[in-house]
Amino acid sequence: MINGKASEFIDKLYYADNYVLFHGEKYFANGCQSRKSADGKIISVRLEVYNLTSDTTVFSVTKPSSIECVRSFEEAAIWDGKKFWEAECQMQWVDD
C-alpha cells in the first residue's frame, strides 16, 4: 500500500474512516459502526465501502462483530475482481 501499511489500514477499519485511491478512483471505507441495545450491548456491526468517483456502494455488510465485518471486507473481491490483500499494493492511502 502506497503511503502506509496495509495492516494499519485494516486495523483502522475497526474504529475510523479511511480513504484510498485505486486505479484512479477514490474510495471511502466507513469504519465499523455498532448498533447497540438500550442496555449498551452490541446488537450488530456494519462496515461499508463507497466508490466516491462513481457514487456507488461497493461493499456493505452487517455482522455480529467488528472482526467478522473486517474479515468479510478482506475476502470481498471488490477491487477489480481482487480481494484486499491481492490489490493493496495498487492502493494509495490518502486523506479525505
Q: What name fits each language-model region?
A:
Residues 1-19:
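Short acidic, Pro/Gly- and aromatic-enriched capping/linker segments at domain boundaries
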Residues 4, 27, 36, 74-75, ...:
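N-terminal cationic amphipathic segment used for targeting or macromolecule association
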Residues 10-11, 21, 50, 71, ...:
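N-terminal non-cleavable signal-anchor helices
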Residues 14-52:
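Amphipathic, interaction-prone secondary-structure segments
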Residues 24-27, 32, 55, 64, ...:
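Short linear sequence elements within intrinsically disordered, low-complexity coil regions
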Residues 39-72:
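Intrinsically disordered, low-complexity regulatory segments enriched in Ser/Thr/Pro
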Residues 59-96:
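Mixed-charge, Lys/Arg-enriched low-complexity segments
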